[in-house]
Structure formats: C-alpha cells, structure tokens
C-alpha cells in the first residue's frame, strides 16, 4: 500500500463523504461556474489538507467527528483553492499540477471571479452555520499567507537575508496553512480546549516548516520528481542552504554568490557552480539538520497523545514530509 493510502486508511470513509459534501458546497446556478468548479474538483491533489483536519479531530477526541469537522475541511479547501486560482493569475502560470490552470483555459477575468466566488462560498459556509471560531482560524491563515508573500517580495530585492527572516517568510507562506488545518481539526470537535487547539496549531506549523525546507533541498539534488535542480536559483528565491552559506562564507565568496544569483541566474553553468559551492560549504547538511529539528518537534507533540490509528497516521504523515521525492 502506498504511503498516502496508509495515511488515509483510518479516515477513508470520512474522506469519501467529504468529497460529496465538498462538491455540493461548490455548486452554483450559473452553468459556467459549475463547469469550472467541476474541472477544479476533478483535478485535486493528494488532499493532505482535509486529511490533517480529520486525523487531528479524531486523534484529540478519541475517534469522534462532527458536521463541523466536515465544514471546517470544506472551508479550508474552498478558501485555499480560491487563493491558488488567484496565485496562478498573479504568477501568469498556465499549469497547476500538470493540468491547465483556470486562467489558461478561461482567461484572467473569469479566473479572478471564480476565485472570488470560492472565497465567498467558504465564508458563507462558516457564517451560515455559526462556525465563527473556525472562520477565524482560516482567516488568520489567509492574512499571514498574504503577508508572507509580500515579505518575500520585499526581501527578495536584497539577497543577503538573515535566517530569522527566512523562517518568518516560510512560516507565513507555507506553514500557516497546515497549522490552520490542524487547529481546525481540534477546534471542530473540542472548541473549548484552547490549549489543545494551540498545541495542534503548533504541530501543523512545525510540519509546514519541515515541508518547506525539504522543498529547498530538492533544488540542490536529483532526488525530486518533477522539480529540476537549480530552479529556485534561476527564480532568485532564497533557500535555507544558500542563506546558511551566504552567512558563513568569506566576504569575497559572498559577493560572488550574490552576483551569481542576481546577474547570472539564467546561466546554466554558473547555476551549477552555485549548487556545487553550496554543497561543498555544508549548506545541505545544515538545512537537513534544521528540517529534522522541526520534524522532531512535531513528533514530540504527537507523543503527548495516546496510541491510536489516527496518531499513527499523523506520525506517518510527519515522516512522509521528510522522506518524499516530490
């Protein structure tokens, strides 16, 4: 059994029911909208976000779930899908997970309106059912994701950023959404357990941090499926291995690195030289150590809960983040 199927196994029935509920939450009286949302639903990824919601909900409650849990997972998916549709417009991207993006097929104007529609559907799903605590969790996440993107744009102009700024960017851009999924799962079944909700939010944040550092490492190795090496350097993205080396090498080497990324980022030979330089100066070892620290912090939180199929699945999920090839 594939690792993702193993993770999904304890919540297989819930995931099947969620699919039906999620489809109906997208429905509209406008035929064009239905056609586009049908296209979106049929090209979904691994569905890690709702899996986090359900597994956490069941782990903290001893196997219980409620309609609130399904609504929470739907709200996360609706609002996150809205942000992805808008992202593709902003990035002028024609592909999403190997398929044509909404803006590629229906142009930017329709893509922006579809994103707005999905956002409003997510908001109304919470408001109509009085799930204001769940709505607050995802709203904070969307705010932080926007701030993280803008912080990255602001700092990208200066390539010599410090490690603390890098962590804040990836916390907001990547980790905050996984943190919201985990907090949402806990809050949907035990809304009064504020300490436990915060604990699960932190658990998700640690996984998200490890996930992004793993993504950074893919840029320097041939391990990744579907991500060519050096792509982050070509796009002038600051990754942890590069930041570490920039902060530990000599001033002359630092200037060469910054110059390479700023002016020669499209030169294949120079990009290869940068990759080798980062490897030789222990950038990958340092990033791997940091990634494993976040992994361990997440596992330490899981250790506080009694053994259950849901805890085991979440442990698998944490380790999958580190061991994945894509």
Show where each model-derived region lies.
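All-alpha prenyltransferase/terpene-synthase fold signal
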Residues: 1-326
């Amino acid at each position: 059994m594939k690792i993702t199927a193993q993770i999904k196994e304890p919540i297989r029935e819930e995931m099947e029911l969620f699919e039906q509920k999620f489809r109906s939450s997208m429905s509209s009286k406008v035929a064009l909208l239905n056609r586009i949302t049908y296209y979106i639903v049929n090209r979904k990824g691994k569905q890690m976000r709702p899996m986090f919601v359900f597994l956490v909900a069941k782990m903290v409650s001893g196997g219980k779930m409620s309609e609130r849990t399904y609504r929470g997972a739907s709200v996360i998916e609706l609002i996150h899908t809205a942000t992805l549709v808008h992202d593709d417009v902003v990035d002028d991207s024609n592909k999403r997970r190997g398929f044509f993006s909404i803006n590629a097929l229906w142009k930017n104007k329709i893509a922006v309106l579809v994103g707005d529609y999905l956002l409003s559907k997510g908001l109304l799903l919470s408001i109509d059912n009085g799930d204001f605590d769940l709505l607050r969790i995802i709203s904070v996440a969307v705010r932080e994701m926007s701030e993280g993107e803008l912080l990255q744009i602001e700092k990208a102009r200066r390539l010599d950023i410090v490690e603390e700024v890098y962590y804040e960017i990836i916390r907001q851009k990547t980790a905050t959404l996984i943190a919201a999924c985990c907090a949402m799962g806990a809050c949907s079944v035990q809304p009064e357990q504020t300490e436990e909700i915060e604990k699960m939010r932190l658990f998700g944040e640690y996984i998200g941090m490890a996930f992004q550092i793993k993504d950074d490492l893919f840029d320097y190795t041939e391990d990744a499926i579907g991500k060519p090496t050096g792509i982050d350097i070509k796009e002038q993205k600051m990754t942890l291995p590069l930041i570490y080396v920039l902060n530990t090498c000599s001033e002359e080497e630092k200037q060469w690195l910054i110059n390479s990324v700023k002016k020669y980022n499209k030169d294949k030979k120079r990009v290869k030289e940068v990759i080798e330089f980062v490897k030789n100066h222990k950038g990958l070892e340092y990033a791997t150590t940091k990634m494993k620290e976040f992994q361990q912090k997440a596992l330490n939180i899981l250790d506080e809960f009694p053994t259950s199929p849901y805890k085991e699945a979440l442990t698998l999920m944490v380790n999958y983040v580190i061991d994945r090839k894509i």
